Structure formats: structure tokens, C-alpha cells
Swiss-Prot record:
Membrane topology classification: Single-pass membrane protein
Residue ranges, annotated region (Disordered): 109-176
Protein name: Uncharacterized membrane protein C3orf80 homolog
InterPro entries the record matches: DUF4719
Residue ranges of the TM segments: 82-102
Organism of provenance: Mus musculus
Cellular component annotations (GO), alphabetically ordered: membrane
Coiled coil stretches, renumbered: none
Cell compartments where the protein resides: Membrane
Pfam families: DUF4719
Length: 247
């Protein structure tokens, strides 16, 4: 015969742990037993959650709450006092998470790192491929980059696009080719509305849509907008008809 903890092969095995059910029963009895109340204290009848307790006067007997219920009452009183602050904290947390979900913070790129889809220029000498070297970029909110973005967005207007096609450029100018004077003109800080004399010769929307379907050699503005050409002299004419650049 083998002793406890030893198998037939001679290998020692740890003994089985004691069952947890008796321990749980003892713990439940320990928690429930102090909670029992009721009964009487001499001539006093205590409630369900009360018991007899001695006071300073040995002859006086009174009923007092059980320790567990007294602790729960104290916790409830403390929570009621701080309920307003707790509600404010919960509302603040909910609003903060909703703001982070609806309005995420913009992605910031460190210095020297180009944005996705924007290649960094190479060195002036041409050593190395573009996008791998060059001076570190400024922050996204620097005034120079802000002016470049405003200048690039302003090229979508009718006047800028018309001037580029009239000069035969056939496309937009990059922000690096824009002069400082044009940057001040298109900047929101220095942006001013044109006068009537500068825009009274511009065609209407319908006329401009018809002009886009014609070649530059066939473009002749209607009689309603004939007059002094924009950027030209009054004597410039071709066979009695004044030709205007395509707007």
C-alpha cells in the first residue's frame, strides 16, 4: 500500500486542496449572524436592525443599530452630500468623450516630416532624391504656410483663373511662384472687394459658360460688355471689334 500523496509509479503528488464549500458557508454565517436583530432589552423592544447595547450608565439599556447597518448609513449620507459633485463629474466625462469622438484633434506632423501626398523639395544642388533631404519644414500654423494655402485656394476664383488662361499659362501657378504683393492681395487680412470699374466689364455666368466651349481664337465678347478692355488701352482693336481675353 502507498501512503497519501504517492501514486503507484512512485511519484509524489500534492494533496487535494480542502473543499471551498464549507469555507463559503462559514463566511456567510459570519456575515449574517451579526446582522440579526430584534428581540428585547429588558423592557425595550428593539427593531429588526437593532440590538441591545450598553450605555455609559450601567443601569440604562437602549437599542442601537448593528455595526454593518450603521456603516452603510454613514456611506449613504456621504454619497448624498457629494451627489451633486458626482453628477457634474459624470456629465463632464460624458461631454469630454463625445467631443473627442465628434471633433478629433488635428494630426500634427513634427518638423522635417512631410504631410501625406506632399513631397518635400530636395537640396538646391540636386544631391539625393526629393523628399529625403532639405531644410526642416515649419509648423503647420506658421504665417508663411498659411499665406501659401490662402494663395493656392484663391486661384479657384474667376479672376485668377481667367488671368492665367489669358496669359497662355494653361494652368495654375504654384504657391512658390506667387509674389509677395499677390500674397498680400489674396490674404484675408488684406482682402478688399473690387470696385465697380474693375468688374463691370466681366461677363455673366451664362456668357462665361459659353466662352469656355470656344477656342481662344474664336472668343469675342458680346456687345453688352464691349468697352475698354481690362488691362489694355482704348485704341487696341482688331477690325473694329475689341477682343477680350478669356475670363
Amino acid at each position: 500500500m502507498w501512503g497519501p500523496g504517492v501514486t503507484a509509479e512512485g511519484l509524489s503528488v500534492a494533496p487535494a486542496p480542502p473543499p471551498l464549500l464549507p469555507l463559503l458557508l462559514l463566511l456567510a454565517l459570519a456575515l449574517v449572524a451579526p446582522s440579526r436583530g430584534g428581540g428585547g432589552c429588558a423592557e425595550l423592544a428593539c427593531g429588526e436592525r437593532e440590538r441591545c447595547c450598553d450605555s455609559a450608565n450601567a443601569t440604562a439599556v437602549r437599542c442601537c443599530k448593528l455595526p454593518l447597518h450603521a456603516f452603510l448609513d454613514n456611506v449613504g449620507w456621504f454619497v448624498r452630500k457629494l451627489s451633486g459633485l458626482l453628477i457634474l463629474l459624470v456629465l463632464f466625462a460624458i461631454g469630454y468623450f463625445l467631443q473627442r469622438i465628434i471633433c478629433p484633434s488635428p494630426r500634427r506632423y513634427p518638423r522635417g516630416q512631410a504631410r501625406p501626398g506632399q513631397a518635400r523639395p530636395g537640396p538646391p544642388g540636386g544631391a539625393g532624391p526629393p523628399g529625403t533631404a532639405g531644410p526642416p519644414d515649419d509648423d503647420d500654423d506658421s504665417p508663411a504656410l498659411l499665406r501659401d494655402e490662402v494663395a493656392a485656394g484663391s486661384q479657384d476664383s474667376l479672376l485668377d483663373s481667367g488671368g492665367g488662361r489669358g496669359r497662355g499659362s494653361g494652368g495654375r501657378l504654384p504657391p512658390s511662384c506667387v509674389s509677395e504683393h499677390e500674397l498680400h492681395v489674396v490674404s484675408p487680412v488684406f482682402l478688399q472687394l473690387p470696385s465697380y470699374e474693375e468688374v463691370k466689364y466681366l461677363p455673366t455666368y451664362e456668357e462665361s459658360m459659353r466662352l469656355q466651349q470656344l477656342s481662344p481664337a474664336e472668343v469675342v465678347l458680346p456687345v453688352s460688355v464691349l468697352g475698354r478692355p481690362r488691362g489694355g488701352s482704348a485704341g487696341d482693336s482688331d477690325g473694329g471689334q475689341v477682343r477680350f481675353p478669356l475670363i
